[in-house]
């Protein structure tokens, strides 16, 4: 008779839910105040003019305008600003 022993258990098989991080509004796009621009872990992007930073480091628009990405400062940090139209 053909027999097969019971398979052993495994300690794998779990993964966390994706957090949907990343840039939500790109350079040159028009945004309204309150729009989320970037969802991030830590400050990969820093808040420039007319941009606020939430407690989870989410960057959001504080005014209506166009999104502008820029690299500035001695540490070449990436800043996101809103330029009023």
From Swiss-Prot:
One of the GO BP terms on file: translation
UniProt-recorded Gene Ontology molecular function terms: structural constituent of ribosome
SUPFAM superfamilies given in the database record: Ribosomal L27 protein-like (SSF110324)
Organism: Salmonella typhimurium (strain LT2 / SGSC1412 / ATCC 700720)
HAMAP family with a match to the protein in the record: Ribosomal_bL27
InterPro entries found in the cross-reference section: Ribosomal_bL27 (IPR001684), Ribosomal_bL27_CS (IPR018261)
Organismal lineage: Bacteria, Pseudomonadati, Pseudomonadota, Gammaproteobacteria, Enterobacterales
Family recorded in the similarity comment: Belongs to the bacterial ribosomal protein bL27 family.
Keyword vocabulary terms for this entry: Ribonucleoprotein, Ribosomal protein
Name of this protein: Large ribosomal subunit protein bL27
A single Gene Ontology CC term: cytosolic large ribosomal subunit
Name of the gene: rpmA
């Amino acid at each position: 008779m053909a027999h097969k022993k019971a398979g052993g258990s495994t300690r794998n098989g779990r993964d966390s839910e994706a957090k949907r991080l990343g840039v939500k509004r790109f350079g040159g796009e028009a945004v309204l105040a309150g729009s989320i621009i970037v969802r991030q872990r830590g400050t990969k992007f820093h808040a420039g003019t007319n941009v606020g930073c939430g407690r989870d480091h989410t960057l959001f628009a504080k005014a209506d305008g166009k999104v502008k990405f820029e690299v500035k400062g001695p540490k070449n940090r990436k800043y996101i600003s809103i330029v009023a139209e």
